[in-house]
Regions:
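Conserved G/P- and acidic residue-centered "switch" motifs that form tight phosphate/ATP-binding loops
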Residues: 98
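C-terminal "cap" of GNAT-fold acetyltransferases
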Residues: 2-7, 15, 140-187
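Short secondary-structure capping/turn micro-motifs that flank functional sites
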Residues: 42-43, 127-128, 174-176
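Acetyl-CoA-dependent GNAT
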Residues: 9-86, 91, 101-106, 110-114, ...
């Protein structure tokens, strides 16, 4: 990782400081592109608490002082064969320094250890960041998907660089013209 001394550890249920930092990071990290995801600290804290379940993976990147720089979660589907990456967030001032990549790689390793075969992520476009947003994807969503272009730094290209492929799209997942782009990779 680009930040010296950064390490990735489990987010523990007894680490109230880290839990609160992660919740604040969720609100801050998603407010520009997906403001309804976690609009307030209460909804973010609920999401973080859910991530601490025994069947879940919840990992944080922390600096030398223990400050949370990023968070990633994973939850099992299909009897544990498929895991969902949900969510991934990195402090804005620490983005593009390898923390997100390290968190994804770490999650992949934990998914493999638990017998997972596939990791998938839904990466919403609620703000016109791709050519899939603001249009009617019916009657042929796959035709639109085949011509997808990134207009404003949508993270689907980050995931492609991490080995994910676009596996589908859910039209109108977040309201009319606001799709969820489904991406997956074998681990």
């Amino acid at each position: 990782m680009g930040c010296a001394g950064t390490r990735i550890i489990d987010l523990r249920p007894d680490d109230e400081k880290a839990i609160n930092e992660v919740a604040a990071l969720l609100v801050e990290g998603f407010k520009e592109h997906s403001p309804d995801s976690w609009p307030d600290i209460e909804s973010a804290l609920e999401e973080v608490q859910e991530s601490l379940g025994a069947d879940r993976i919840s990992r944080v990147a922390v600096d030398q002082k223990g400050t949370v720089l990023g968070w990633i979660g994973g939850l099992p589907h299909y009897a544990g064969h498929v895991w969902e990456l949900h969510p991934l967030v990195v402090r804005p001032e620490h983005q593009r320094k390898g923390i997100g990549r390290a968190l994804v790689a770490d999650l992949e390793e934990h998914v493999r250890e638990r017998g997972g075969l596939t990791l998938w992520v839904g990466t919403d476009d609620e703000d016109g960041s791709t050519t899939l947003s603001g249009v009617d994807l019916y009657p042929d969503p796959l035709e639109h998907l085949a011509r997808i272009r990134n207009l404003r730094g949508h993270p689907y290209e980050f995931y492609q660089e991490m080995g994910f492929v676009i596996a589908g799209v859910m039209p109108d997942a977040n309201g009319w013209g606001k799709p969820d782009i489904h991406m997956a990779k074998r681990v």
